[in-house]
């Protein structure tokens, strides 16, 4: 009997202790920010042997054997409130021809971090990169470490950003962003001593009505950006804009709209007519048909007030459209006038299980540093950071998909940018299409951009088309192909930059995975440039053909 009673007491005591110890688990997890933290470190080494044959009018026939070795390191950190990623590569290039050899090294990195102390309220972000970018717009699609490396310039960019979001309130919702970015580059052979060195400060935000608003729907938006040119004290580029509207509801679906807009662009410290401040204001009234916050169309009659005499006191019709056709399809559009005349913006997005597309058209007054610091991304594929093909990518299942820290939306086309930091009016149309089903991953891109150099009286147009295909032949073997084409046209008052260039970049290759860590591939690449558009400093001139055969081996450490 005594033994039985003692045993029962011991079991009761152990049970109490176990319950107490279990209580400490959630308490420790709550007070320790690293309790759920995860740190991952991976790496890879890639080696390429490239046989290259180049034919050009200026250099004749040139045969090269090139060896590249590229080690890469990827480090990521995740916790409840912090996530970050750093990826770095070092590319060693060793070229040999019949008469001489050449060795070069290119170090690159990219990083991103986000701290969210208050979810859906406040977050801080940091991002940046060190890359080698093409500086010769006539060599668009054709410059890399192997060919036209003299057109590359080491470019650094860093951005710090704070975001505030106050939403789903009864009367007022608020969204705001403050950011600082710096962009700098070294010179290249093709651009001479021209280099970027700019700091940008930007604030933008919006205030809208809350959920309780029934008879008055309103919105106010504003933005200010100052880009300081550290190479020149009289070239600070300042822009500001503000616009707002109010819909006074007359019935369940119809409302009277009043609207106003302000815009100003100026290069401070310069008073010449080409760069004087361009200020434009407009106001108007009209009607709105609204079903809900994602389905409305508004038409207004507006009056303008501008520094430009030809655009002052003009009447014009404005359009504002937002219409969700379904949970998979969204259409946005806006039409009106700005200081340069008629202006429009539009976007269409569609997403299904295996097909995703995005089409956008926009106009902005900007320069090279701003384009590099805030790139447009309409990527329809999500890929691991550092991925070079779409074979490892996938289609997100939602229009609002947010990539994880080690993922990124891949922009399959890029803008053709000149590194002179002139103020330009850029109009661009960008189409991205992706398909992912079974063994096939396919992507198509179409990009048209027009750069109007406001203080140089010259124009550049770029039309580019591209297609990428990855076909899984078997469990370990895939066929990859890419073809890209660009037509570049230049016009200038003195005819010094007039001309046209047709650029081709095509690749087909076969890759095979061996085990969990090793991958081999064999590919053929074809590059071609023809036309009469050249800046005069290109190594191979304006007409040349480059053919390559590449054997590649990649080892990945996980």
Question: What are these model-predicted stretches?
Answer:
Residues 1-40, 390-403, 558:
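Cleavable N-terminal export/targeting peptides
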